[in-house]
Amino acid sequence: MNYLNENIDSLNKKLQDGEITAEDLAKETVKNIKETDKKINAWITVDDDAKPAENLDFAKNKLAGIPIAIKDNIITNGMKTTAASHILCNYMPVYDATVISKLKKAQATFVGKTNMDEFAMGSSTEHSYYGATRNPWDLEKVPGGSSGGSAAAVASGEVVAALGSDTGGSIRQPAAFNGIFGIKPTYGRVSRWGLIAFGSSLDQIGVMSKRVKDSAEVLNVIAGPDEHDATVSEKEVPDFTSFLGQDVKGLRVAVPKEYMDAVDGEMRDAIQKQIDVLKDAGAVINEVSLPHTKYVVPTYYIVASSEASSNLQRYDGIRYGYRAKDTKNLLDVYVKSRSEGFGDEVKRRIMLGSFALSAGAYDEFFKKAAQVRTLICRDFEKIFEENDVIVGPTTTEPAFGIGEEISDPIKMYNNDILTISANLAGIPAASVPAGLVDGMPAGLQIMAKRFDEGTVFKVADFIERNNKFYEKTPTGMED
């Protein structure tokens, strides 16, 4: 079964009406993945024997029997979880991440784990031990990263929704490149327990889907307190679907000058068109400045790489994961296991982070980056004193070609320039389709105050209802 023209509501109705059984839905989903994925390589693991939960309550649980894709850095009990790395290629977890436990309680069906950049470090899903994922709109283009597998699986109609993780744009950039919706909630809105750590002060699990409402339905389930994660907020979780279908009259919309100056030509026109839609509907558009935008890339890569170098110390060839053969002593085990188990990009970030944290460089690099991060947060706080939401482009350009930027790390890192700030500030941010640029999707980024995902959904839904981009079929999937 292909989901290009389906959503959670339509599938829920078919299940309630008996038009299809949950068992058949799972089987058809796996069958379609096997066929479609020959083109795009969106999956690392597919569960051939995927089965729905028992005693499904379709009326109570919107997600009951609905197949959901899971990014392969989210722990799943009894299902291989690799983070797209050689070092974890045979890792079989014995527990579920909190988000998985919550989805199981909601009776969702799990069909497999999606491809990604190794340990979520990348912007193209080319840095994977399991090969690159291709963009369903153009099979010679990247799907973005690091949640490129989840994005491609949704865009190609393999599933209606998928979980991803976002450390510097890893949900929003792939969402933009693939013409789907993707949301990174506020830091602390969703438990990170069971998410394989990259940058612990930046990581956040989120949702990707073709329709805005589908992400709202999934976020309703996975958000909220968790005794296993001390960083999760105790704030009450609203019904995010209640923010849909509203108008935007009187909404104060900030448009950062620095973001619009980063794009030109068709990309700028596509973004401006969506801003004009909001203006014509009665929103108040205000040009603003985020003066520290020029520092976000170096700040992020120092902070994220430093946290990564610490988090990845646990992969040593001893406790679990890949262990090198023909080693002479304990040091040899450490060195060879990590050298052979990690890919080039992961090793690059570990080295960068280790240097930034070293005694001679700490004050000049990590401490300075932490101080600049505070200034970036203050920029956003100031804007939100007089505005309800910030909008602008998600990326500076549409999807680039496979192999085009992989040998140029600096160029690859700059792909994140418009998305990183939301992670540094811990605010909710999403990307919603804004049209086509050179035949490839472009995304409008929407950001709001901490724990105000509702306004993000409100604006995204308004844009979606206006342009109906979800009706388009990815050109790479056309027969």
Curated annotation (Swiss-Prot):
Annotated function: Allows the formation of correctly charged Gln-tRNA(Gln) through the transamidation of misacylated Glu-tRNA(Gln) in organisms which lack glutaminyl-tRNA synthetase. The reaction takes place in the presence of glutamine and ATP through an activated gamma-phospho-Glu-tRNA(Gln).
InterPro entries: Amidase, Amidase_CS, Amidase_dom, AS_sf, GatA
PANTHER family, per database record: GLUTAMYL-TRNA(GLN) AMIDOTRANSFERASE SUBUNIT A, TRANSAMIDASE
A Pfam match: Amidase
Enzyme class at the top of the EC tree: ligase
One GO CC term on file: glutamyl-tRNA(Gln) amidotransferase complex
Protein name as annotated: Glutamyl-tRNA(Gln) amidotransferase subunit A
GO biological process, any: translation
Assembly information from the UniProt record: Heterotrimer of A, B and C subunits.
Family: Belongs to the amidase family. GatA subfamily.
GO molecular function ontology, one term from the record: glutaminyl-tRNA synthase (glutamine-hydrolyzing) activity
Top-level division of the source organism's lineage: Bacteria
Catalysed reactions, semicolon-separated: L-glutamyl-tRNA(Gln) + L-glutamine + ATP + H2O = L-glutaminyl-tRNA(Gln) + L-glutamate + ADP + phosphate + H(+)
UniProt entry keywords in alphabetical sequence: ATP-binding, Ligase, Nucleotide-binding, Protein biosynthesis
Active-site residue list: K71, S146, S170
The protein's Enzyme Commission number: 6.3.5.7
